[in-house]
Each structure stands twice: as structure tokens, then as C-alpha cells.
Amino acid sequence: MHQVTSCIFCSIIQGNAPSVRVYSDNEFIALMDKYPVNYGHTLLVPKVHYNDLLSMPLDLVGRMYCLATNLAKAILLSIKADGFNLGQNNGRAANQIVPHVHVHIIPRYNYDSPNGNWPSRKVASLAELGRIAESIRKSIAEPLSSGYLQ
């Protein structure tokens, strides 16, 4: 599996950096964003390092977005959000901070941005993130057993 030693996501995948995982399979991990826009903000990351979406095989891109959609359903169910944003940035000009492909699944609530701007990012403790992740994992468990995430 191709990894980059200076990449925070590769370090997390290898178990060398802390994270709060929501989901993991052979190809992807989903983890809580440490600085969430809203609580439940989850990052879906391929386990193989790709700098951007254009460097990923198309079949893997398709699987990533199918999984992102299913994770979004579990997130909405678990934290009672009103909607969600899927975000994926490619390159510095597009505000890609970590040069490892990832999809942001951001729960949204009616009136969470009354002035039309994004809500401010929060700083969440690992304990807070762990509680939210557990709730999301419970929402994944039933759909997973019925083939929902496969």
C-alpha cells in the first residue's frame, strides 16, 4: 500500500497518529474531523495515498462516493441533522490543505448559518469526537448488516 511518511492521513492509517475512526474497510477509513464545521463532520479517506481526485482510479472514486453517500445517511440519522454538504478539494487553489484525497461529510442544520457564511470551525476533544463517532457507528451497524454499505 503506497503511503507518504509526511502525510497526516497516511500516519493515521498506519496507526502512528491519533484519530477517532467511524468506519474502516480494506480501501477506506472514515474519521471525525478534529476541527469540525458542525459536530459529526466526518472525513472519508482512501487508505492508499493519492494527492488528488484526478490521480485516483475511476472505479475507486465511484466506490468512495457511494460510501460517502451511505455514511452521510448514517450521520444524518445519528445526529438528527437537517442536511449535509459533501466537499472535496483538489489543489492549493481549491483550498486542499492535506494533499491526500479526502471527502468532507458535513452535517448541516436549518439556521446554522443565518448570515449565509459557513459556521465557524470548532475545536473538539477526542472524548467529544468519540461520543459522536459511537453514535454514528451505531447508525452504521444495522445498514451494514443488511448490505447497506457494501
Short names for language-model regions:
Residues 1-150:
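HIT superfamily nucleotide-processing domains
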